[in-house]
Every structure is written in C-alpha cells, then in structure tokens.
Amino acid sequence: FRVAVAILGISMAVLACRVPVKGSGAMTTDLQIDAQLGESRWPREAEATRSIADLIARTIEERYPADNRPARRDAHPKAHGCVRARFTVEDTLPENLAQGVFVPGRSYKAWIRFSNGDSDPERPDVLGDARGMAIKLMGVPGAKLLPEESTDETQDFIMINHPVFFIDDPRDYLTLIKRGSSTNPLVKLLAPFALGLKGAMIARAITKKQIVNPLHTRFWSMVPYRLGDDARKQAIKFSARPCVAHANNNIPKDPDPNYLRKAMANTLSTGDACFDFMVQPRRSETMKVEDSKTEWRESEAPFIKVATIHIPKQVFDTDAQMDFCENLSFT
C-alpha cells in the first residue's frame, strides 16, 4: 500500500483554489475565502499549509543531496514526455463559461507533460500508479495570482486519471506526509490511517490504476477551481477526454519499464492525438467545494466541452526535449 509515496505533493497544487493575498515573504498563506462559491476555512489551515510546504522542501533536499542532483519533483517525477499541442476554444460557448482563457475561437500554443505519480522516477510503468496530465498554455495575457509569476503569460491545468482525491483537510495531509516521510518503518505504516476509510479506499483505487497509453486516457482536476472574477464567477472542475474512444485496453505482456513513453511515441510517429477539454460547473450547494473526496455526478452536473486539444504528429522523446520537460513547472 504505497499511499504515502505514490502521490505526495500533488495536493499542494490541487487543494482548494484560493486566491493568495500579497505578503512580505516569497510565500503567503493568507487566504481569501469566497463563501459565495462554497468555500470555507479549515481549522488551522494557514499553519498546516506552511508546514506542508516546509516538509515537502525538506523531503526533496534529503532525497536529493548535493551529490545526487538535479533534484526531481516530489511527486510525478517520472515524465513520459512533454508534447507540443494546440488548445483551441470552441467558437461558441455559454455566457457563463466564455471568460478567462475560454475566449470563444481563441487558440493557444501549449506544452503537455504526461507522468507517473510515484516518487520513484525509475518505477516501471506497469505497476499501478496515478498518471498525470499537466497542460501549460502559452501567450495568455492578464494578471496572475502568484507574485513570482506576475509577468508570466501562461495558464496551467493539472490533472490525474481519477475524478476525486483521497484527502481534503490540510491537517490530515500534514499527518500523512509526516508519517510517510518518517524513517521509522512503524510510523510509515501508520500513514494510510490519516486518510480515514473513504480516503484510503480512494488512494488504493488511484495507486492500482494501470493504463495502456496516456494519449488514450481520461484525466480530471479532482478538485474545483474558480472561473471568473465578476458576477459570473463560479466553481468548476475540468477534465480532458480523448476525442475518440480506444478499444484496446490490454496491458502488454512483459512490457518495457517505460512502455507508456514508447506507446506515446508510437502513436505520434504515425499520426495526431486529440482531447476534448471540458468543464463541469457547480450546480448546487450539495456539490461541496471543500470535499475533494466526493465526485460531482455528471448526471447532475454534465461536463461541457470548451476546447479541443490537438497534439500533432511529432518526435518528443529526444534527450534535449526530455531535459526541457524536466525544467517545465506547473502550478
């Protein structure tokens, strides 16, 4: 049961979509709570957030000492590759969705990184794991929330191949990573108990997942994000789904340890790939913004296609492009 190491760190990117308030330090944990969108503050949330960030930083430093650099990501360190793409917004959209980056008809250059979630970058792909899809749109104008990215013209979307996350309370997450990073084997064994029964079941489902090809896999944001700043602002989740369903879901026999990269390379050596990018607007107060362990049912809140992701035929697995991939960051 690899919960403590399989997806550590990802919740720093996907826990509640807060708006940081400008502070004096490089990182601020002051949070603006938007009750209109269903947000509420967890007890000791700011303190837990600071502790989580500090502990993750220490864990990376310990995992990658000076003689073992460069350091990798704390989670999703194994990249299958970064591919060039084009993100094109639909020509017509409902008024409540036609805001932010979703300007009808607009097209963005993009980079997409596909990955495994486990902290071991050498772990064979055939073993169950969370699989990541991180999209970086280029040429996006407008103010950014993070002070260190205030002049960047980018927009990131971070997803994994599961619709929900295994934890929501930052205090429980802090307990999880403290136990998971402990050098005491007995303490490490206690890590899953920080999740509770429902969280443990979700974590087990996530870390057992096997896939045939990242380009044939659906991905979800797991948690809500805010779309818009004015009276039309709303909480949404998002998802990327292959434009065409693929019938072959059989894991290859005796696969190469990096067979997911090879599968992507084979697909893009002969043709293009495509995803529908969709958003799921929050429809009612029963869809809890702070509950990342409960899925918003599509029967109650259908996903709406807002853009098409076109990945052209290409060679992406060169040493130079893999190095470029390692240097991309997603927030």
Where are the predicted features?
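Active-site-adjacent core segments of small-molecule enzymes
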Residues: V21-T331
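Bacterial N-terminal signal peptides
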Residues: A4-A13
